[in-house]
Structure formats: C-alpha cells, structure tokens
Amino acid sequence: MSQISMFVRKLHKFSYNPNYKFKCGLEIHTQLKTKYKLFSLSPTSYNEPPNTKLSYFDVGLPGTQPLLNPEALLLALKASVALNCDIQSYSSFDRKHYFYADQPLGYQITQHYYPLAKNGYVQLNKFDDMPDKVISLEQVQLEQDTGKTVNYDDRINVDLNRANTPLIEVVTKPDFENIDQVQAFVRKYQLLVSHLDICTGDLETGAIRVDANISVNNNPRVEIKNLGSSGEIVDALKYEYNRQVTLLQNNGKIIQETRGWNGIATESLRKKENAVDYRYVPDSELPVIRLDKNIQAQLQNTLDELPDSVLDRLTKEPYNLQLAHARNLLFQPEILDYYENIFGRIRDANKWFFHELLAAFAKSDVEFQVDIVSPDMLVDIVSSVEKNEISLTGARIILKHIIRNKSTKTLPQLIKELDIGKPEASAELEEAINEICQQIINTNADVVEKIARGHTNALQVLIGQAMKATKGKVHAKEFRSKFMELLK
C-alpha cells in the first residue's frame, strides 16, 4: 500500500484516545485590506508581476525609515473590537530579528512587548453548528508580512511584493479541545473579517494563514506552520495528534519544535525558538501609539452589525429563515441588502426571493446581480401576479427573459412583448380552455389512469402541459378546476 493510501486510511479512521487529551491554540495571520503597505506608500499587491510594487523601505535599503499607515491601524482596531478585545491605550512596535531571504530588513516589525489589544474572546454557538464554547484570545498585534520565496528547479527566487503588507496576528489561548472546534473557529473568523471588510477572508490565497500549536496531555507544544486551507488544518492536526500519541505510547518524548505540513505528514523544520532567540528590541524609528480612552466605544459605534447578530435576526420573526439560507445571505452582502429591500414589500418574500428569483438566476447559469432584476422590478412582478394580471408561469417567463437578455424594458412592455398578459374572460376563452384540457387528457391516457387510481399529484403533469401550451397566460387554478371537472 502506498504512503498516501495509508495516510488517507488513517485519517479516515481518526478518533481521539480518551487517555490522551488534545489541546490546541492558534496564531492567525490576517492581511488587512489597505490601499498601501504598513510602513511605506507602496500599494499592496497580490497578483502583480514579481518585485514591481516596492519602495526603498520594502527592500531594506539603508537609510530608509518606516511611516505607519493609519488605515492599517484603523482596521486592526476594528478587528480587535469585533473580537471583544481590550484596546490598549499604549502600544508600540518591536523588531523581531531573524535572517531569511524573504525578510530583507533582517528583522520583522511586530508588537511583542505592548500589543494593540488583549484579552478578547470568540463565542462558538448554534450558528456554528457547535455547542456553546468560549475561545479566549491573548492578544491582537499589528505587524508586517514577509516576501515570498518561489522554488524553480535548482533556484530559489524571491518576490518582495508582499513584504511590508499589513497584518494582524490574532493569538488564541490553548482552549480548543477538539479539531471540530478549531474548524468552526477558523470559519467564524473568516466570516467576521470578510463581513467587516477587514480582509478578504481567503485561506487559499494566503490572505489568512494559520499556525497551530498542539499538545497532548500537557506535554511540550508543537507548532505547525502556515496551514493554508481548512482541509490542511484538519488533516495536519489529526496527523500530529496521532504522531504524538503514538510517540507517548512507545515511551517517547515530545520536544518543543516547529513542524511543517507537506500534504501527507508533519515534518520537523527547526527546534522551537523562544523570545531570546529573536532578540526582540523596541523599534527606535517608530513612535509609540497612544489612543484616547474612549476609542473602544467610538469604534464600537462604527462597526457594521456582526455576523452572529445578523444570523440571529434573520432566523427569527419576521424573517424566519432557515439557518442555511441566512448563512448564504451573510456570505454575500449584496444579496442580503437586496433581500432586506424587498422583505415587507411583497407577501411571501422568502418564496419569491429564494425559490423564484435566485432559482431563475441559477437555471439561467447567470451570477446574481442586483442591477439585472432590480428590487422594484421584482416587487412589480409579484404585484402583477397578485392582481391576476399575469400568472406565476408568466412571472417566471419574465424573470428568465430579463436575466438571459439583461432587458431594461418596463414590466408592461415585457408583458406585451412576451404576450403573457391574462386574456379577458369570455365564452371564447372558456371554450379554448376546455378544448386544451380535453386534448391533453386524450393524449395522456397513462396519467389519467394514475389519477383515476387515486394518485392526485399526477394532475400536476396535466396542468403543467396546459400552462406550457398557453405560455402561462391562464392561471393554473383555472386549469386545475377544468381538469377536475372533465375527469369526474
């Protein structure tokens, strides 16, 4: 059996050993959505050609000095408040010394001694499909990102576009008792920072990178660096837990170290450093940050409604949405705004929004866009159905036409163009309905036989054919009445 097959089988059968307690803490590095870098006026860059978005400071040119970007500070403060942290009135920057090719300064500017915020928490709950659980946070610190090293055959290339990009590092306490809690926390954190427009929230693009510190039975902790997806986090933690348990069962010793994840196993990178190894010193070129004592309350008033609050509101009266629908809206703010715009303006808004409008976009293989079917247009379409000016089928035809053709015509123009207005009641109309129904009955003997045996749902097949034949001009209830009369 190959190594990969054995690995997949082992993770698939994963379970916790009751004699070996899992404990985990996270360090989450989050790129802030700023226009410029943390300590220079270079634009932040994610998809540009290598080494094209740089300043002299970004590349560590001697004599250049850092200048703090206030936009990055504001986003870091907003994140700290959203994470229920205590904003510190005094914070400062420090130099973390180490040598690596992607760090041209020879040190990283971070906040080791006096971070921006401390003592936060995140509450896991029913909205995360989890029992209530509080995950405490040690601190939130503002720091600069490194560049990237890219391996090409026998060469290592360095791209410094990412160097000096603003980050926050969120450090949790080791409160995670299982991997499900870790996964739920990371999902919740992603949603929070993307919802507040602090970060894109993407793991796969590197906008969020996770380091996990795991220990078993309070033995020395092992850090797993740079986990870049939810799947990597889960698989790496499962593997590392099994590795440590196996080691302890065989009278081995866990050493404090840093390990990486290669897609199959964790592998040792280096002995775990401590603060002495990094030679932290205050950065003499950056002033300390002093904040007004009322800054926390002021920031609280500027935050958008937080995700849990939105979910709580949407799953209660008057919306009464299923949690899955509420989550989908929360992940797409533009669609949430649309939904709240039409709610209260039309009856049965949930049916029209989810089962008619979004379904019409999906069936047309078109991504939802507010300006294709405006809220006012949807309200007008529903109103026309309620006034019996068009049928439900007619409304569906109109929606499909608008979406596929990006039509900007008015509703009356569309009704006329598509010829789906309800015909005036007359003897001729009654005769036409009777004739259509009789013809459908004559050509669907098997369906008629099912109805005769008591399968009344089969009547819907006949009604559907009648609606199609009349382009939805006649309401389904009229066809239902006529079929029931003819089939007595």
Curated annotation (Swiss-Prot):
Its EC number is 6.3.5.-. The keyword Kinase does not apply. Pfam families: GatB_N, GatB_Yqey. Keywords: ATP-binding, Ligase, Mitochondrion, Nucleotide-binding, Protein biosynthesis. GO terms for molecular function: ATP binding; glutaminyl-tRNA synthase (glutamine-hydrolyzing) activity. InterPro entries: Asn/Gln-tRNA_amidoTrfase_suB/E, Asn/Gln-tRNA_Trfase_suB/E_cat, Asn/Gln_amidotransferase, Asn/Gln_tRNA_amidoTrase-B-like, GatB, GatB_Yqey_C_2, Gln-tRNA_amidoTrfase_suB_CS, Gln_synth/guanido_kin_cat_dom. Subunit of the heterotrimeric GatFAB amidotransferase (AdT) complex, composed of A, B and F subunits. Allows the formation of correctly charged Gln-tRNA(Gln) through the transamidation of misacylated Glu-tRNA(Gln) in the mitochondria. The reaction takes place in the presence of glutamine and ATP through an activated gamma-phospho-Glu-tRNA(Gln). This is Glutamyl-tRNA(Gln) amidotransferase subunit B, mitochondrial.
